[in-house]
Amino acid sequence: MNTSHVRVVTHMCGFLVWLYSLSMLPPMVVALFYKEKSLFVFFITFVIFFCIGGGAWYTTKKSGIQLRTRDGFIIIVMFWILFSVISAFPLWIDSELNLTFIDALFEGVSGITTTGATVIDDVSSLPRAYLYYRSQLNFIGGLGVIVLAVAVLPLLGIGGAKLYQSEMPGPFKDDKLTPRLADTSRTLWITYSLLGIACIVCYRLAGMPLFDAICHGISTVSLGGFSTHSESIGYFNNYLVELVAGSFSLLSAFNFTLWYIVISRKTIKPLIRDIELRFFLLIALGVIIVTSFQVWHIGMYDLHGSFIHSFFLASSMLTDNGLATQDYASWPTHTIVFLLLSSFFGGCIGSTCGGIKSLRFLILFKQSKHEINQLSHPRALLSVNVGGKIVTDRVMRSVWSFFFLYTLFTVFFILVLNGMGYDFLTSFATVAACINNMGLGFGATASSFGVLNDIAKCLMCIAMILGRLEIYPVIILFSGFFWRS
């Protein structure tokens, strides 16, 4: 990588750091309103990174070199690393929070990747500016995920949306958002914000206080899962709040391009036609029904309570939101394991959810069905069809290789944690929570991830970023072929 391209990457990263420093202004307003000392912490963070980012951006602006695909991969990974470090900075320098740098980094990575795992034991005791700040991290990270998945990664030839755009029927094929990245980002921002406002209003109507409604609204639509209370949604002990949280978890797992088309055209036909969405809703319904039956069968709740609690928690874990009821850790182990497995499914491509995504599972299901049919009729000329379109070998290879890498990293992280002395259930739940960007642990990490040692926390930070970027943009940087001229 020559000097000129280093300048290009530095220029872009400088601009992103400068832009992200502005995100410290809303928490400053909250701290000022509630007269909290954290105002100074956010101000210092703003000044430092405003100057660093602005300086890097300004001093490299005359590079005159065009961005290459290789530069794009580097910028994407640097985007999440830099944002994670900046997000951790105010949490680290505030002595009243008493967080080590590793703890602050874990919290920052968890927030900006919309994971929602926390190392803070008593979230409820945090100053309100930090409570808002954590939810804002989720919201900004969620927008970054959507823009990355829908607009950026397809330009680099990777990501689920590229697969969707080139081969699958649906919005990416026939209804491209806008021809320019900036316009696409703006369109997605408006759609995302409208859904967030709707969620806040519904929380407020369900009886949630305004501050809590704002924080939970923006963390719900981002599927981030940070809460203003240690008990999460369980703090409110309100069926309506759980219904709102579960409903918006599912709605936020829809492809955001679909939402844009629905809003702009004032028709729900795109939702009805989309085969990935139909498959996702079918799986979601199945998970909710199975979970409801399990908790009702053992007598934890009556039939009504079983459905409400299961609808909320199943929707939250399936979509990798991570909001929880207060007593979820007391649910039967087999039920929690079932929900942890469902978190690998995730939601639709082009949403804020984590996991492998429903379109990939749909293709794998169709491929498995195809193999069975081919074995039954060896001479028949059969093909894999999804929504009336033939799935090409290139797409099939892409799906299988992603599935293999995702499984490989999951098993690797589980074995490493288990080798550190954590029991298997804790290791599995912790890795599932992090690599799927779901955030809910079980076993030793049910209440907080602070029980992990520093090495384990760093590994889980890597898992969160790998899951958020869908693996390829990170591991490609370690390929010798990538760095050849």
Swiss-Prot record:
InterPro entries (UniProt xref): Cat_transpt, TrkH
MF (Gene Ontology): potassium channel activity; potassium ion binding; potassium ion transmembrane transporter activity; potassium:chloride symporter activity
Say what the protein does. Answer: Low-affinity potassium transport system. Interacts with Trk system potassium uptake protein TrkA. Requires TrkE (sapD) for maximal transport activity, low activity is seen in its absence; no further stimulation is seen with SapF. Transport in the absence of SapD is dependent on a high membrane potential and a high cytoplasmic ATP concentration, suggesting this protein may be able to interact with other ATP-binding proteins. Can transport potassium and rubidium.
Q: Which family does it belong to?
A: Belongs to the TrkH potassium transport family.
- What are the UniProt keywords, alphabetically? Cell inner membrane, Cell membrane, Ion channel, Ion transport, Membrane, Metal-binding, Potassium, Potassium transport, Transmembrane, Transmembrane helix, Transport
Give me the residues that bind K(+), please: T114, T115, L223, G224, D320, N321, N437, M438
Give the matching Pfam families: TrkH
Q: Which residues cross the membrane?
A: 6-32, 39-60, 69-93, 128-153, 181-205, 277-297, 392-419
The biological process GO terms on file are:
potassium ion transmembrane transport
Annotated intramembrane regions: 101-112, 113-118, 209, 210-221, 222-227, 238-253, 303-318, 319-324, 333-344, 345-357, 422-423, 424-434, 435-441, 454-465
Residue ranges, annotated region (Selectivity filter part 3): 319-324
Q: Quick one: where's region Selectivity filter part 4?
A: 436-441
- From which lineage does this chain's organism come? Bacteria, Pseudomonadati, Pseudomonadota, Gammaproteobacteria, Enterobacterales
- For the region Selectivity filter part 1, give the residue spans: 113-118
Cytoplasmic topological domain: 1-5, 61-68, 154-180
GO CC: one term? plasma membrane
How is it placed in the membrane, per its record?
Multi-pass membrane protein
Identify this protein by name. Trk system potassium uptake protein TrkG
Please name the source species.
Escherichia coli (strain K12)
Cellular compartment(s) = Cell inner membrane
